Amino acid sequence: MNTSLRLNHYWITCADGLETLLQEEIEQLGTKVTERKAGRLIIEGTLEHAYRICMWSRLASRVLLPIHTYELERTHDARDVAEELYEGAISFDWSLIFAPQSTFAIRLHAEREIKVNTQFATLRVKDGVVDSFMEAVGRRPSIDTKQPEITLYVLAGKTEHTYCLDLSGDSLHKRGYRRFMTDAPIKENLAAAILQKAKLQERNPEIVLDPMCGSGTFIIEALMILTDRAPGLVRRFGFNGWHGHDRELWLSLKAEAAERHEKALEQPLPKFYAYDADWEAVKATRENIIAAGFEKLLGDIQIEERTLADWPDFGAENKTAFIVTNPPYGERLGDKASNRSLYLGLSALLQKNFPNQYAAIIAAQIEQADVLAFEAPETLRLMNGKLPIYVRFGTVKPEKVTQPFLANWQAQPVEMEEAQDFANRLQKNMTALKKWATKENIYCLRLYDADLPDFNLAVDLYGDRLHVQEYAPPKKIDPEKAKKRFNLALAAIRAVTGLNRDAIFIKTRARQTGTNQYTKQSTANKRFIVQEGKAKILVNLTDYLDTGLFLDHRQMRLRIAQEARGKHFLNLYSYTSTASLHAALGGAASTTSVDLSNTYLSWSKENFVLNGLTVDHADEQHMFFASDCFEWLKEGHEQYDLIFIDPPTFSNSKKFHGTFDVQRDHVSLIKRAMNRLTSEGTLYFSNNYRGFEMDEEIEALYDVEEITSETIGPDFKRNQKIHRAWKIQHPGLN
């Protein structure tokens, strides 16, 4: 059955989740929405209304004019649907819509209940249109699937098939400016929807920042909104070959849009910042901005290759800022853990640089969005193609200015009948360390380390949490007696520090052999962030015997941070690569971290991402290798200016053939590493083996200086044997 053509009835399609925003936009354009369905709005209006939506809608996907409805009288199977679509197509005189010399294409969509081979059914619709032309005028149009002059949109339904003329031609999200692509881009209409949901124009910002700009979509869409630039001003449409096209009407709307844009350009614009860690993305952004027609505005747009760790001083204290970005989730980054660290790092940067300013951040998982520190957050779920995304909107909370725990701690009288000596010693240590920790901003330090023989434990402070390690008692000590003493010590720790039970994490530490330190102790996975120098570091006080941060090497890491600028840094037995992190934040030209454990290298990458540094091997700035260090040194030839080696005392990993003994093997290890050290470079070698002696061969071959005293902080002065460290250089430098 053929229904007559109505020029006041249109379908406006959109991505799932945009229906409400699209309805608001359409009604602002002066058109009434009469019906709303998932991914589609139906309007009643004139051809001018449809043209205005084509010209001005930033959110719509397509503007469709239903021109023919074929009502069904049969039940469905796959073959019936295709034949019905053919019958529906041939039953309409398509020569009334477009000329046979025009090219056309078919876009077929089926409702969920309809099972049909869309490729075959599309061919049958094409056959029906062509056969209709042959019957009507004796000539047939040609198919062009890439740039057709006419696009027919067909919806296969349960009771009827609807044939529409696609006035938009190509999807309206294609504005015509995207000349260069990056991985996992955001569609233009979704970017515009996010900006409109965030009320960009009403906020009238002085700064617009996209710190991970990709191909520049957010920056360009913001420019279009703030300069009143119609998204359809310079693109092709699907109505030019339509017999019903009103060319004069369209040209008048186009002239009106151009005039509005020129007038808006006379108004002051915010300063735009478009950053990305990938040079190709920076290049794509610049080229796309030019392609969008904003070349004259490049002076107002700072487009630079920058990581999150390399933000400038925006001078935003007294300015209104708007931050929007599509972080490299999923395809653009990798595992969920690294993604979460990225959002934690971004949130911290926003709190520091843009407190009380408005932001809109895309996330692939809701858990990523949840770590963003926003006041009164709102979340919008959208579909970016087939990929669900979550957009978190909100005002950035101000940064919490924290001081080291000891800065605010005050000694109080403590009475502990059976553990008074321990309580007094712990309090004495904390009092002695308070001034140093406060002055140097030390957040993580050792408070007690088996100072008294009856209390054989270590107490470490990580931020505002305690890590208490009970050293395994000698066999001659009664286990019940040892347990009682440990419980007394815990009570004293709570009394002296004032910390609750949930801030104290307890482990038993035995002598380490092989890879015990890498054995998981629990599955709690409760990691949190601590500060050391410029670095934010993830620590875990529950899952492993070691926490992810060796406190005794703090001074060495800070030394590396001071010496690393402009240098190529190598970290062997890197563990969670905190030394590499300090080197990177200190301005190292590159860092390379080598460790046998994939678990700790993954943790390493999270530390880097948390601090806004890239971990993509493609740029070769920060590299991570899961390898035996001996083999890795043997296979490569790259030279390094600064090398740090902190090997285990002993190792017999399943991944490593044979064993490693630091006393036995340090000569060959150091010699291989020195072969990779530049002529004027420095190698730092350290280990925790109390009986270690540097071999005379190393002292004969190189300039060797023991610097142990320089690498032990005040919190470890009570235990001078915690580690030993040497500075090693090629002969003749001193």
From Swiss-Prot:
Q: Where in the cell is it found?
A: Cytoplasm
Q: Which residues form the THUMP domain?
A: 49-167
Q: What does this protein do?
A: Specifically methylates the guanine in position 2445 (m2G2445) and the guanine in position 2069 (m7G2069) of 23S rRNA.
Q: Where does this chain mainly localize?
A: cytoplasm
Return the CDD domains for the record.
AdoMet_MTases (cd02440), THUMP_AdoMetMT (cd11715)
Identify one Pfam family in the record: RlmL_1st
Q: Which GO terms describe its cellular component?
A: cytoplasm
Which PROSITE patterns does the annotation name?
THUMP (PS51165), UPF0020 (PS01261)
- HAMAP family found in the cross-reference section: 23SrRNA_methyltr_KL
A GO molecular function held by the record: rRNA (guanine-N7-)-methyltransferase activity
Catalytic activity entry: guanosine(2445) in 23S rRNA + S-adenosyl-L-methionine = N(2)-methylguanosine(2445) in 23S rRNA + S-adenosyl-L-homocysteine + H(+); guanosine(2069) in 23S rRNA + S-adenosyl-L-methionine = N(2)-methylguanosine(2069) in 23S rRNA + S-adenosyl-L-homocysteine + H(+)
Taxonomically, the superkingdom here is Bacteria
EC number(s) on record?
Answer: 2.1.1.173, 2.1.1.264
Family of this protein:
Belongs to the methyltransferase superfamily. RlmKL family.
* The protein's name: Ribosomal RNA large subunit methyltransferase K/L
